[in-house]
């Protein structure tokens, strides 16, 4: 089953969030950024309400611009430092994050007109900012 959400229309969609689901692979295919999630994703609490009985999920983001920004949360090493910051990192690291030994989990996303900001976690918080005109959820 395929669900399509358009981010280039006057009314923005409410896109479901596969919260705490592990992203296994991230690829780029003809202006589509593709997140492939773990098998048996329907066992996750956040997915049970969205799509009960789902075996797998692939999310495809159609990019308006193939450039995107990737940020990683950093906190100073100082013991008493209470504040951290997001530091921009090389966007090519995105593809390596899913294949690292630390599970890359999808946390949430923020939707705006032709824009999407995705928060993920792999040992630290990762923020991805994209220019997107449509999002497709492929459920199996």
Stretches found by the model and what they are:
Residues 1-140:
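Surface-exposed, interaction-prone regions used to assemble/regulate multi-protein complexes
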């Amino acid at each position: 089953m395929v669900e399509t959400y358009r981010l280039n229309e006057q009314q923005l969609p409410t896109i479901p969030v596969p919260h705490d689901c592990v992203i296994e692979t991230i690829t780029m295919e003809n202006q589509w950024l593709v997140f492939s999630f773990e098998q048996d994703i329907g066992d996750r609490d956040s997915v049970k309400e969205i799509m009960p009985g789902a075996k797998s999920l692939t999310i495809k983001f159609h990019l308006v611009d193939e450039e995107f920004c990737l940020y990683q949360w950093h906190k100073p090493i100082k013991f008493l430092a209470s504040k951290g910051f997001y530091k921009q990192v090389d966007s090519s690291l995105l593809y390596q994050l899913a294949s690292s030994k630390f599970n890359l989990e999808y946390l949430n996303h923020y939707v705006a007109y032709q824009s999407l900001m995705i928060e993920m976690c792999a040992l630290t918080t990762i923020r991805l900012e994209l220019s997107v005109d449509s999002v497709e959820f492929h459920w199996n």
